[in-house]
C-alpha cells in the first residue's frame, strides 16, 4: 500500500473545504501577541524587525478569521493579503486567500482550481492548491512545476519544500525527496509532515529505529488517523511483533484501508502465537459470490479459502483496473504465508515483491526487512537461498 498517494487524495479534499483547509488552520504561533485594537496602528507595513512582522502576521490571520466568520469576506481577503506581505514564507496566507476567493466565486472545485491557476500563474496560493490537485491526480511533473515556481520567488517557504517532498516521495524519487526534506527541517524542524516523510526514507535505508522515532515525534506534534498503521508496521520491521500487534489494534479504520491494518496485525500475532491462534485477527473472509475491494482477497487467501493462483489472478485484474501494484502486494503476502507455514520458497517470493513493489510501499519495506532478517539468521557458509531450500 502507498500511504502517501492515499493521503494525497485527502489533500485534495482539504483544498476543497475552507473549514478543513488553510484558511481555517491553526493560527500561527506568535511570540509577541497583538490585540485587535492595537495591531492596525502597529502593522502598517513590514519592517526589518522579523519578530514584529511575525506578530503582525498572526494578528492579521486572526483578524481575517473574525471578518470571515462575520461574513465580511472582502475584509477577510484584505487581511490575508496583508498577512502574506508580513510573512511571505508562510504560504498559509496565500493559500487561504486563494481558497476563500475561489469559494466566494463558487469555483472551489478541481476545474475551478485548474482554471484559476492557469489564469494567474504568479499566484503562490493558487499554485500550491494546483500542486495538491496534481499530486492527487498523480501528475507529479505538474505538481513539481507549480512548486518550483513558488520556490523561485519564496525559497524559504517550508510548505513549498514540503509539497515538493511529498511529490518526490509519491513518484518515487527518494534522492530528490531527501534534499527536499532536509530543506524543510532546516526551516521548520518540527514539521510533522516532513518528519513522517523522513521516517519513510529511514525505513527504506534500514534505519527502523530512526524511522520509528520520526513517526512517534510527528504523532506527538500532530496526530494523524494513519499513524498507528505507520508506527505499527515499522515496529514489525524492527521485529517488535508484540508492540506492532498492540499498535495496529488501535482505531482500525473501515475497509479497504483497515484491511491492511488487520493483515499486518495478523502477521505480527502469527509470529508470536502461530497462524491458527492469530487467524482471528484477520476477521471474516469474503462471503461466497461477493466481490470486495483489494486487499480483501488477501484475507481469503490467508484463511485458506482461495489458493495462490486465484489470489494472483484477482491481483492482476485489480491492478489492471486501478494501476496500484496489487500483484507485488500479493507476492509479499504469499511470501509471509509461506514463511509462517514453512512451505514453498518464501525467499523467492520476498525477492519478487522487493523487485516489483514501488519503494514507497509498505510491502516493499516488509520484503526487504524479511530478506535482511533471513540473511542474518542463515547458517554460516550458506546463502539465504540455501537456507530456504533446506526447509
Show which residues each predicted segment covers:
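Structural marker of alpha-solenoid helical repeat scaffolds
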Residues: 52, 86, 119-120, 153, ...
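Canonical positions in the second alpha-helix
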Residues: 49, 83, 115-116, 149-150, ...
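Position-specific recognition of the canonical hydrophobic site in helix A of tetratricopeptide repeat
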Residues: 68, 102, 135, 169, ...
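Residue-level detector of the short coil/turn that links helix A to helix B
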Residues: 71, 104-105, 138, 172, ...
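Helix-start (N-cap) detector for alpha-helical repeat units in TPR-like alpha-solenoids
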Residues: 50, 57, 91-92, 124-125, ...
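Alpha-helical adaptor scaffolds
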Residues: 98-102, 128-132, 165-170, 193, ...
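Canonical tetratricopeptide repeat
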Residues: 62, 96, 129, 163, ...
